């Protein structure tokens, strides 16, 4: 296996090294699910059932990590909730997992490796049994990979943010950190159905059709004009590579076939003209990449769930580089990640709040679903 395959990127972000995994374990909401999720309406476990984070800044135990994952996964996958709870209660399996490097013990990574290696559609007990029996195959793959989910639906809030900061027809240079395979670097190549209180707004003509529910304001009315695009990732994936596409599919929940269909459609759209993705570290490579933007374009740097996984110093370096180059910045990150965005929000609220905040140039715009399926404007 080539060296490019040996350096995978961070959980669900597709980029960077994790120095502190605590941000991954957000405080769960009281209830989770959006109605479109198979797990809609699943309630948060009673108080006391979710173990507290270590107060000394240390790493949570593997058992605690999987129990917390079960709470978060209730938003997206009932099957993976079963898997997480079963692993959390299996001392033999936890002991095996603890032999992996710390940054490779994340539930999302291990579930994805299992999917890549052909785990059947089984309940929690069946998954734990399969995992133990196949550990000799699982361990080396888990030790060399890190998840880099690439969800094209995140283009829906991206389109909304770009409309707020660009003029109609203004050409944009789009630069994404943690780009994975680059599915979010081509928002104008897809089509959209934004559903708001005043009806449905359709934009674009490409595939897949990305559906987003909008509340608290109007739906976007135009797509961006992307004249130049580049991505940054420690280990870029290629939509033309069957191996890379198989990994992208393995990163998705087994009980969300619509996400797999959407991924395949986006891959098909991009495979004849894939975005260019530069291999490298965001803090180190972003300055040169921004310097390469052709003149006359509005430069927009995008982070769709990536900054949370960068070490603090690297995150600050990225923000400083964007400011120094006079570029715009669109972020879809956990709400408390960027203090200046939180401060700018003040007392503004969204009709349908989520743990994720869409912001542009430091101005908070809306709450949004982690994978882009809802957008709730702040007011």
Show which residues each predicted segment covers.
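A short SAM/SAH-binding and catalytic strip from SAM-dependent methyltransferases
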Residues: 299-312
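Short, Lys/Arg-enriched N-terminal segments with co-localized hydrophobic residues
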Residues: 44-58
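Class I S-adenosyl-L-methionine-dependent methyltransferase module
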Residues: 100, 120, 149, 168-279, ...
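Non-catalytic accessory regions outside enzyme or core folds
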Residues: 57-99
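Class I (Rossmann-like) S-adenosyl-L-methionine-dependent methyltransferase catalytic domain
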Residues: 270-275, 287, 316-317, 321, ...
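Class I SAM-dependent methyltransferase Rossmann-like catalytic core
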Residues: 95-169
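Low-acidity, Ser/Thr- and Arg-rich intrinsically disordered low-complexity segments
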Residues: 1-15, 19-31, 36-37
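Conserved SAM/SAH-binding loop
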Residues: 280-284
